[in-house]
Structure formats: structure tokens, C-alpha cells
From Swiss-Prot:
GO cellular component: chloroplast
UniProt organism field: Carpinus orientalis
Protein role: Usually encoded in the trnK tRNA gene intron. Probably assists in splicing its own and other chloroplast group II introns.
Keywords annotated in UniProt: Chloroplast, mRNA processing, Plastid, RNA-binding, tRNA processing
Name the record gives this protein: Maturase K
Amino acid sequence: MEEFQGYLELDRFRQHDFLYPLIFREYIXXXAHDHGLNRVILLENLAYDNKSSLLIVKRLITRMYQQNHLMISANDSNQNRFLGYNKNLYSQMISEGFSIIAEIPYSLRLISSLEGAQIIRSYNLRSIHSIFPFLEDKFPHLNYVADVLIPYPIHLEILVQTLRYRVKDASSLHLLRFFLHEYSNGNILFILNKSISIFSKSNSRLLLFLYNSYICEYESLFLFLRNQSSHLRLTSSGVLFERIYLHRKMGDLAEVFVNDFRGILCFLKDPFIHYVRYQGKSILSSKDTPLLMNKWKYYLVSLWQCHFYVWSHPGRIYINQLSKHSLDFLGYFSNVPLNPSMVPSQMLENSFVINNAPKKLDTIVPIIPLIGSLAKAKFCNALGHPISKPTWADLSDFDIINRFVRICKNLSHYYSGSSKKKGMYRIKYILRLSCVKTLARKHKSTIRAFLKRLGSELFEEFFTEEEEFLSLIFPRTSFTLRRLYRGRVWYLDIICMNGLANHE
């Protein structure tokens, strides 16, 4: 946003949300080229002279609005040219350009809300690991958890209808609808592996924006009821008028939807629940009875079906007791087990024993799924026995060692917050031995002979990062004490999951 504030008349667009004229600005097409286009594809276009041709973009938009426009068959869509340009190239340009201008209302609202609340923007809030300190603080005091899979809209029109709540410009929405139907060919947008099935990889930014806008609208309704009701529940009885206003607001929301959804809302006068989401999976946790959790389940199902017209089933939401269920979330197995302990105590002449059962969040490394990810990447077989990586055998020794060490360190970095670190030793063993077998395969030698020649220097490369980090925490302690330290370390610079950890 900061790059374009000198060009855009933000005050006018803030008032009217007229975004359609922006797509015909030359600097938008140039910014779309700089942000998203592949340079290799540009070189293949003979009519492209290192500048974004706004005239051709206008012609392509005009063709989409025409009833009898020339259709390019799917068999030769990558080779055909129309007026000397590549259709995929300029469809990508329109996609990137629309993504840039459609993000303007969201960015303006975010900046204004941060400035109005005087909130300091912290980059640590982007870290995935910032979720786990929250879970450690809240989960030991809760009883039940609901594992929710957010349903995906299977039709493009649902995403367009969702976007109209934020973008008031009808022309932009019409252009988006024409563009999606022109280039999707009726394909389903989302698939079962919880990732976006992109009909063209070049349009990933646009589809991610549309999906995030759908999630934003869903959470705006859900979190409004949760936050407002929780606030009123914690305040004194002097805010009776605020409580009446909230219940009236909930009634207004219910009138918008069908009668079934109105019946569900009436049960949720005082919800008090914790909510965490990452990608297409969310967690609801509460201290109340299972009855309230079941009410929340049917509330969410009714919200998706009645408001967003997305099919959902109560069976997609699993309610379990935290002390008896392990939660699979963000590559960790998390639960809150009861750890009974006997504490002897004495008061005057009477002695007695106190049964204490403290609850603490356990975050465990999922060994079996991780081994499955390593086997899929050809580092080991299905049983976890290390094998060589033949596709890397043509690299230099330095590159081979560096790749294995980087994978091992990234996994150690991500799973540093595990409460039980013994599982990581097996993962490191698989990667180390796979590295040795790959090097031995390259040099056509046995593993024993190669290790004898190389020595123990190779194994030290896999453990240096953790020891260097602990030396910063305990600079004055001995090396032995640092090796014995097994506390949790949550890094606040992890903005994406490790590819091997993302086994869901």
C-alpha cells in the first residue's frame, strides 16, 4: 500500500470504494508485472517490449464482455496468440492488478483501526509460534475442545458475493465475475487437501485474496458475538443497556437469516469461548458443559449454510475432552493430561497427604506423520529406515551436506517448543544417516569407509544451531548444563510451516 499512496486518490476511494477505474491505470499494470509475473513467460511474448501494454489489457477486458468473442481452445491455450499477445500472460496481469486494487479497502480499514486504537504493529504477531503461548496460557483452564474444518465454497459466485460486503463498486465485481468464469472453465476451486486448486498458477494471489475475504466475513460475524458477549459477561451489572443492545443486535442478525438460524442464535446469549484458526482449520475451546459446545457446533453449521450458502455437516466438527484427546494442530500433537502428584503436608500435630492434579499443555512431536513425510520425500522407507537420496548425488559434497543440515535445523527450529524432545532424535538420526548414504553413493564407497575417512565433523553440523541459541540464553553456564536444558523455546520469526511438518 505504501508504494501506491502517491498515485491513488485514497480519500475519494475511501468514501466511495470506486476501484474499477484503477485497473486502467498504467502504474497498476506495471505494479502487477513487478509483483507477480514470471520473467521467463514475458520473454516468450514477441509483442512484449519490457513494458506492460495497457492497451492490450483493455482489449482483453473488452473481449470478456463481448458475447461472441473468440474462444481459445484448451488444447492450444498456451501457444495461441491473439493480436500478438499471450492470453495467459495478460490474464495474469488482470488477476494481479485486480488483487492489488481489491486489497485497498482492507488495507485502509486496517491502518485506520490500528491508528484509532493506537496499537503498535508488531511483526511477531505474524509468527505461527505465537499461537502456542496463547494455548499454554488458556488450555489448562478449559475442559472441552472442538476441532473444526472450515468448509470451502465450491462455486466461484459464492466468493464474489462475499466480497461485495467490503467492495461496494459494482463494476469491479462484474469484472471479477467475468474474469473468473472466463478462465476457470467451471472447475471446482477448492480440493480436499486443504489447499487451493488453482486453475492457473499465475492467479494464486487473486484466489488467496478471495478465500481470505470469505474467511474474514465468516469470522467477523462469529467473533462479534463471541467478543461482545464475553466482554459483557465479565463486566458489572451497570452495563445493562449495553447487554440489551447486544441482544437486540443479535436479533437483527437473526432476522437476516432463516428461521432455523434464528433458533440457534437464541441459545447463545452468553457465549464464552476461545477461538484459534490457521489456514482452513480452527479450534474452539470452552470451560462449559458439552451442551454449550454442541450448541456452538450447530450455530456454526447454520451460519455456513444459511448465510454463506456453503454446505457443511455437524460431523465435520469434533468435540472432545481435553484431558483425554490429543489435538492435531500446526504439526503438533497437543493435549492437557492430568498429572496426579502426592504432596505430603503437616499442620500442627496432624499430617496428611494432598492429591494434586496440575494440568499443563503438552506439545508432542508427531513421529509417525513426520516419518511418513520423510518417506514421501525419499529420505527413508515407510518403516523409517534411512535411504540415500539419489537425485542429490550429482551435487557437490558441500551442497549435499548443506541441504540435509538445513532441513534438520529447520525441523529443530520449528519443534523447539515440544515438551518431549526425544522424538526429534530419531528424525535427526534419519536425516544424518540418509546424508551419509547419499555421500557414500556419490563416491561409490561403503558407509563405514566413508565415515572413517570423514570423521565426526559431519555429525556436529546437525546440532550447532540449538547449542548456539542456548549459549545466548545461558552465556555463563557450562556447556554440559546447556546440553541438559530441555525447556520449550517458541520462536517468533516463523511465518510459515515447514514443508515436512505440514503433514495434515
